């Protein structure tokens, strides 16, 4: 119970604030990195850091291998792929974001062109020439460390797609197709790429096949087209398939022999006899007595019902039994009956035996009749299909298939053969993929290596056989929604498919070009046009449905976005067609996909989130870890299993009771097996969950007391945490779940130390760490640049703050700087606020939230939002636009914030309508009016030929300028402002260079000093005589820079010193080269869109306080809108006079069933009061220094012995005070999902904090001073401010744009639109009888064009009468009617 949740409780931040955990189940399995899904997939695709010779055939390597070699049509040239390499990216991530570039590396592919000499007569070829050359194939986007891509300057995420796994699936129509409600079974073979193959029963119980959902054919047509035994025997004997004169298909006899066993009837003197098969006779009632054919004795009387046992008994007595002629009638022949002498066919395979046919065969003297074993367990489906199939040979079948696939084209045997080969048996056109082959082997019970990726004859036959078995009631259909049948396509695989398409387009062009150029003189790069491949990549990242603008509202939303699984997208489902089953939770989701986190609305269940411990295996199936259990004893061994592997397991819950040795203690254990819950004995359990939170996703695992919330509200809670806006001062939750640190670390919002070392320098914008190696020697310098007030995709503010001080020791993996929404290395989406559950004058009706003025005043929920505005100066036909301060007809007051270049200063406070960047655009020459002529004569030229197109701040935005960036085209002179920005940037780079060089130099000199100490000098250095023993005093007399010139007599030491010098000089040269490269990039000028000469980006920081209309929420789906800000003195207050911060409506709890919020309130109340007690002890300790023991014993009491001994006991005074200060606001606790604090723990904490265990207190009304009638639940609850801010939504319009057709005002804030006055509003005005108001609403205030003008004129003349005309929408209606051929005339009648 006293475990700490953070794995890194001893880490740098973990020691500063310790989270007490209520978990009873420890973490056995480390949680995988949360964004590994993305990173691992793309690394496997690029194999960037793998030597070209060692690359596995996956990803990019596999794409090139599958498309190359490319041969020309004449067979004289071949282009082969050797290998590829990715060079260094041109710009780093930061530069790409600033310049609007794509973070990508140039892809160089080494290609080999082989040219042959072909002998005209013999056709033999000899190699004439081989040319190898690296060819540039476009840029390949790289993934950042955080699993995102920078495309055109914005961060994007490629969402993984869930799709149906390739393989074979059996299903039925659930009785919906046919009116009788009988099940029609179907099988479908789905390849990774290529044609789909469907087998289905129709209502007449015949089996049909469809290729690519085309017209159906009898299945036997497909079987005829497959190779028969004659051809297979010829190939088996070593004949090349190409050399066979003709390929023989399967015959009717072969088809029937595959699907049916035979029953041979023999003629005896006593009549026809058959072998007695107990299976065939089981369960039937005999119509006549059974007589042994050999002895003639009766073995069973007529009317007997044969059971399995009696049938077996009879089988022991009689081998063959006599049957009447009636038993032969209606049976089907299994083989062709042929007269061996004459070759005459008496009966064909599959033919039905009728009375006449049987008599004819008897007269011909046939003594043995092989028939098909069709009985009540095996139906005649294939035989019946054979009977209705009009084809009987392979050629007919192929031509039939050709007609279905290419209707309207005349078939020839050759084209039909080629089409059929290409459909399922050609590697280039049909690919099951290794996954598909593995799935197919498992389902069909065949054993083909996973390199066989096309269909085989055996696969098709087995599929049809299993389909017929299903029809006969053997076996079960597949569950399409089982995660064993759905797989994940991550970034790497999606990218691989896209790149393959690009290369295939390129391949065609290469073939044609090889034919049209002189193959002897060209080089590989002359043949290649990489545009199609580059375009495919660009299109995928830029406009694919799965390439999404990253949700960067806060660190949790980033992590969740990268872990998202979508069933939509290319090759997936569509919202409209997805049924209920696909969206529903499935038993196999356990531990793989979160059952809670999914959007509300049309996408529910189609977009999911990976569970916390889930991983995706190499086949794309989601796996979850299980602990192994042997003989009822739980081991610490664990392994990851997919849904298919889990099918065999008996899995116990993570909280199954066990003793200290790990033995399960209950007599019966609750387990999951094949999707059901059962009770079994401990020795039958095979495995066990690793953690209670493995079932839910990251966002759901952040909700404390999730087990006490209704699922619908938990869904809202996990979704709303992703919308929490980063606050100026965030608090980590008092009541957390222990997942907070993992999310903060893996999200990339914080800065994590790459190597161990000592902090050397620090300021607000960077941290310099002197990295130390294994032996403690300096290994180099790590400079961490902090992101300061940068804009996220959602306009929230990204700002990082250092957590370390100079001299601090950090180890690899420590969090050294907090980012947005993190505090001390833990996720901090909101604030802990004191909250009371009670009604307050109707202000918290219907989920409204009442807040105290303190919250607004103290910036508790204040957030900073950064808006980006950009303006471009283009080269127009009339001349260049210019960015300038000299704008016509604008007063000095409006230009007060602009510098001499016309760009706003950083730090300026700006309001709506203020000019941010002055810009003028040339105006076309138009004839001048006399007034203009006069003005021009007086004021000179400038004013008239340009117009003001400055960038102004849009309405509703007020803020401070935090950053300005100026981009100039190459070759265009930079203005003063651009030069100033460039100088500042170069200074910053130079400072980094100097610091890094300084640290390297210090380390070098220290090691040099160690080498020199105690050795006699060898002379040749001014000021040190030969033979002088070198000591600190000797060195102190000389400047440090000169030490490197001192030489000593010991040759080994001299060699060491020379090596040191070389290493140091190389390191310094590398630092300088890096600096010069960056400066060169800065001064070079920017790549701007065509026609743009200059671009300016202005960033405005807007401070948003909490105000009425803003949306807030807790973590339990308890959301509401702020209704009123109440003065502090009017808020209800506690007995000690503390006013509460928030008042929530208690009626929001019972019907919503999210009781977790109440438990959180109680526990938060206890935490805060414990923190207060610790704060008092710290004060005493500071005053008189005597209270250390009391403080330690208090901490021991709170955290328990284990944590105390592990972490707290060996702290020094400073560390102890820092810890206690961090606990002053409350002792943070972790109550993990499904394994958290019990009610008894909460009561325990409350009593320890000296509070009433009911969690309720007497509150006093702040307005009357009277205590409320009964006690009120008060406590600390974690509240978030959501990204639905009233300032972004409020909007007003007087006049503005109108729609062209209807002439009605546009809608929406972005269009500066009006509010629709809808039909219900019209009814309201009608009900009031407000006729004139109604008339205005429907005419002059909306779409009566002439009326609008008249109103304007009347207002200008200061009159108040006007006339309403005909609304434009009425004219539109008339035009619509006229377009239908109805002539509508308006009659002008006076009233």
From Swiss-Prot:
Keyword list, A-Z: DNA-directed RNA polymerase, Nucleotidyltransferase, Transcription, Transferase
Gene Ontology process terms (BP): DNA-templated transcription
The protein's Enzyme Commission number: 2.7.7.6
Keyword Acetylation: no
Catalysed reactions, semicolon-separated: RNA(n) + a ribonucleoside 5'-triphosphate = RNA(n+1) + diphosphate
Molecular function GO labels: DNA binding; DNA-directed RNA polymerase activity; ribonucleoside binding
InterPro entries cross-referenced by the UniProt entry: DNA-dir_RNA_pol_bsu_ext_1_sf, DNA-dir_RNA_pol_bsu_external_1, DNA-dir_RNA_pol_su2, DNA-dir_RNAP_su2_dom, DNA-dir_RNAP_su2_hyb_sf, RNA_pol_bsu_bac, RNA_pol_bsu_CS, RNA_pol_bsu_protrusion
Family according to the record: Belongs to the RNA polymerase beta chain family.
Subunit structure: The RNAP catalytic core consists of 2 alpha, 1 beta, 1 beta' and 1 omega subunit. When a sigma factor is associated with the core the holoenzyme is formed, which can initiate transcription.
Biological role: DNA-dependent RNA polymerase catalyzes the transcription of DNA into RNA using the four ribonucleoside triphosphates as substrates.
HAMAP family in UniProt: RNApol_bact_RpoB
UniProt name for this protein: DNA-directed RNA polymerase subunit beta
Protein species of origin: Granulibacter bethesdensis (strain ATCC BAA-1260 / CGDNIH1)
Lineage, broadest ranks: Bacteria, Pseudomonadati, Pseudomonadota, Alphaproteobacteria, Acetobacterales
Gene it is expressed from: rpoB
